[in-house]
From Swiss-Prot:
Binds 2 Zn(2+) ions per subunit. It is an enzyme of class 2 (transferase). One of its GO terms (molecular function) is protein serine kinase activity. The modification Phosphothreonine is found at residues 181, 316. GO terms for cellular component: cytoplasm; cytosol; mitochondrion. Its EC number is 2.7.11.1. This is Serine/threonine-protein kinase A-Raf. Interacts with TH1L/NELFD. It comes from Rattus norvegicus.
Length: 604
């Protein structure tokens, strides 16, 4: 016989406390309860279980005697157990889980499930759907119920009830569909009690849309209509009666034996139509998610060549030709110099595009898409302004020192962003820095390690590529397997600073390209710092010298460079604009009475 699950029918009042019992609860929790004469284990643990969202119907209690667990009935008197230890475990049939809280902003109308007040910023359990304010978190039970798992348990429970072998008394006015859906006001509905845990109702909505955030795509659970607590208690009781009773080995009551399962439940082939429909819909939803999830993300960024119109050739660089084009507006299309790309090159190029498509910064040219047919091409925003090289060395634009320092700051800011994204430019120079709409710096032609590497078949060759004047010594020597680093970009930035602070290119007195490569690679040649403008601040001169160091370990990184320039900008003297005041356009004499003026003239 199974021990009774309810409280003992005793009218005796509990007497004084006689001791304590230590109780180990689920989820690695523990408590100490007071032992009183005339009280049972059921009564003593009632409060400790309810504050944790549990009840006696879904748990089993053991006595811990010499390290071994012995099942104990709930109606056992607590007084003889003074000084002992009890263990409470959740029945295996009851699918209780831990909460999965996420911070959420509720843009639709929502209310806290505890204080019932309006909720905008709060938390939500992805498993059971409970939502609450931060200051209401102490009222949330430590365990929750996955309602999708409960629905399957409900189906099996009702199927067993309809089999006749272990029938329970089901309320006659409730059908199967009514049992599985939230009920409105009825004789069985109880009002929410703040001390009792009320599970949210399963709404079973269709699969939510694929969101662009990293939040898991889970079924949203509505909590507007709380589930009838009497139904939950009834179902939990049906779970507990699924067991055939504990044997002599002290097995818990809630653990059904294989014999009891096979004798009480029907064949697995005879399933309810509702359960079959649910499993079919879940399978269809999984297929939809799989089809959407495994699509290559580059699919949405590759532009068909038929949609792009090339208008005018702008110029040719080291790695490609730039055209002005039309694709939903003016764009810049750079057709890269890659003849007959191999499969390895194509895959490496697409991998780089997945990195570049995530770049968004005010000082970086906006990446808009790419093309792989008939050749590699990159589509970026169109910049109306000219390059920094054109301003300094062709148009001979005159900038004051404050403007030059601001251009240097914006360039360092854009490079700092690229390095934070682990993108090495590899070809930073004044030709790839554009002044857009005034003095807004836009850095282009960044990344593209696939295109900027010499290939021999499927293997990259270790040869220097790029513009000689902006190459660091280690890039020219090519002694390392991969000489390109953050510090090599810093050296190129130092040459750009040299152009800004002198208005000329380095090594202009040497006409041989091979001689420049040899002498810079050996460390015999460096930019002439005597040409720097006389009004250049000393801090900028020191920064330029540090960026052009021969040893790359001695060069600063862009976070330090940016901080130095920003500090320099704040220290520069500025002409503060005076506050505007009205001008009366009259002299002080106009305000004096005429009699006073005549009297003043008579005074000797």
């Amino acid at each position: 016989m199974e021990p009774p699950r309810g409280p003992p029918a005793s009218g005796a009042e509990p007497s004084r406390a006689v001791g304590t019992v230590k109780v180990y609860l689920p989820n690695k929790q523990r408590t100490v309860v007071t032992v009183r004469d005339g009280m049972s284990v059921y009564d003593s643990l009632d409060k400790a279980l309810k504050v944790r969202g549990l009840n006696q119907d879904c748990c089993v209690v053991y006595r811990l005697i010499k390290g071994r667990k012995t099942v104990t009935a709930w109606d056992t008197a607590i007084a003889p157990l003074d000084g002992e230890e009890l263990i409470v475990e959740v029945l295996e049939d009851v699918p209780l889980t831990m909460h999965n809280f996420v911070r959420k902003t509720f843009f639709s109308l929502a209310f806290c499930d505890f204080c019932l007040k309006f909720l905008f910023h709060g938390f939500r359990c992805q498993t059971c759907g409970y939502k609450f304010h931060q200051h209401c978190s102490s009222k949330v039970p430590t365990v929750c119920v996955d309602m999708s798992t409960n629905r399957r348990q409900f189906y099996h429970s009702i199927q067993d009830l309809s089999g006749g072998s272990r029938q329970q008394e089901v309320p006659s006015n409730l059908s199967v569909n009514e049992l599985l859906t939230p009920q409105g006001p009825s004789p069985f509905t109880q009002q929410r009690d703040q001390e009792h845990f009320s599970f949210p109702a399963p709404a079973n909505p269709p699969l939510q849309r694929i969101r662009s955030t990293s939040t898991p795509n889970v079924h949203m659970v509505s909590t507007t209509a709380p589930m009838d607590s009497s139904l939950m208690q009834f179902t939990a009781q049906s779970f507990s009666t699924d067991a055939a009773g504990r044997g002599g080995d002290g097995a818990p009551r809630g653990s059904p034996s294989p014999a009891s399962v096979s004798s009480g439940r029907k064949s697995p082939h005879s399933k309810l139509p509702a359960e079959q429909r649910e499993r079919k819909s879940l399978a269809d939803e999984k297929k939809k998610v799989k089809n959407l999830g495994y699509r290559d993300s580059g699919y949405y960024w590759e532009v068909p060549p038929s949609e792009v119109q090339l208008l005018k050739r702008i110029g040719t660089g080291s790695f490609g030709t730039v055209f002005r084009g039309r694709w939903h507006g003016d764009v810049a299309v750079k057709v890269l110099k890659v003849a007959q790309p191999t499969a390895e090159q194509a895959q490496a190029f697409k991998n780089e595009m997945q990195v570049l498509r995530k770049t968004r910064h005010v000082n970086i040219l906006l990446f808009m898409g790419f093309m792989t047919r008939p050749g590699f091409a990159i589509i970026t925003q169109w910049c109306e302004g000219s390059s920094l090289y054109h301003h300094l060395h062709v148009a001979d634009t005159r900038f004051d020192m404050v403007q030059l320092i601001d251009v240097a700051r914006q360039t360092a800011q854009g490079m700092d962003y690229l390095h934070a994204k682990n993108i090495i430019h590899r070809d930073l120079k004044s030709n790839n820095i554009f002044l857009h709409e005034g003095l807004t710096v836009k850095i282009g032609d960044f990344g593209l390690a696939t295109v900027k590497t010499r290939w021999s078949g499927a293997q990259p060759l270790e040869q220097p590529s790029g513009s000689v004047l902006w190459m660091a010594a280690e890039v020219i020597r090519m002694q390392d397997p991969n000489p390109y680093s953050f510090q090599s970009d810093v050296y190129a930035y130092g040459v750009v600073l040299y152009e800004l602070m002198t208005g000329s290119l380095p090594y202009s007195h040497i006409g041989s390209r091979d001689q420049i490569i040899f002498m810079v690679g050996r460390g015999y040649l460096s930019p002439d710092l005597s040409k720097i403008f006389s009004n250049c601040p000393k801090a900028m001169r020191r920064l330029l010298t540090d960026c052009l160091k021969f040893q790359r370990e001695e060069r600063p990184l862009f976070p330090q460079i940016l901080a130095t320039i920003e500090l320099l900008q704040r220290s520069l003297p500025k002409i503060e604009r005076s506050a505007s005041e009205p001008s009366l356009h009259r002299t002080q004499a106009d305000e004096l009475p005429a009699c006073l003026l005549s009297a003043a003239r008579l005074v000797p």
